[in-house]
UniProtKB/Swiss-Prot annotation:
Location(s), subcellular: Plastid, Chloroplast
Cystine crosslinks: none
GO biological process: ribosomal small subunit assembly; translation
Organism of derivation: Phaseolus vulgaris
One Pfam entry name: Ribosomal_S19
Origin organism lineage: Eukaryota, Viridiplantae, Streptophyta, Embryophyta, Tracheophyta
One CC-aspect GO term: chloroplast
HAMAP family: Ribosomal_uS19
Its job: Protein S19 forms a complex with S13 that binds strongly to the 16S ribosomal RNA.
Protein name: Small ribosomal subunit protein uS19c
Family of this protein: Belongs to the universal ribosomal protein uS19 family.
Signal sequence region: none
């Protein structure tokens, strides 16, 4: 289900504070965050945000096409290694 348009998009307060601080200083530091549920808003464009995937932080450069999506969409948590090899020799 999508979020109601009457409500504002969810952005974690600490993340919003960090972005506003960097915007006033006009700096482009990497921002570490664990908040995968935060929505990307236009003030984040141009920043690099390192999003936690459960193991490490993946740096993602925010572009204008990402606005409206969640941060967690851009850092995959699972890596598929492939199906088990069908080894007929082990069956005999």
């Amino acid at each position: 289900m999508t979020r109601s348009l009457k409500k504002n998009p969810f952005v974690a307060n600490h993340l919003l504070r960090k972005i506003n601080k960097l915007n006033t200083k006009a700096e482009k530091d990497i921002i570490l965050t664990w908040s995968r549920a935060s929505t990307i808003i236009p003030t984040m464009i141009g920043h690099t945000i390192a999003i936690h995937n459960g193991k490490e932080h993946l740096p993602i450069y925010i572009t204008d096409r990402m606005v409206g999506h969640k941060l967690g969409e851009f850092s995959p948590t699972l890596n598929f290694r492939g199906h088990a090899k069908n080894d007929n020799r082990s069956r005999r």
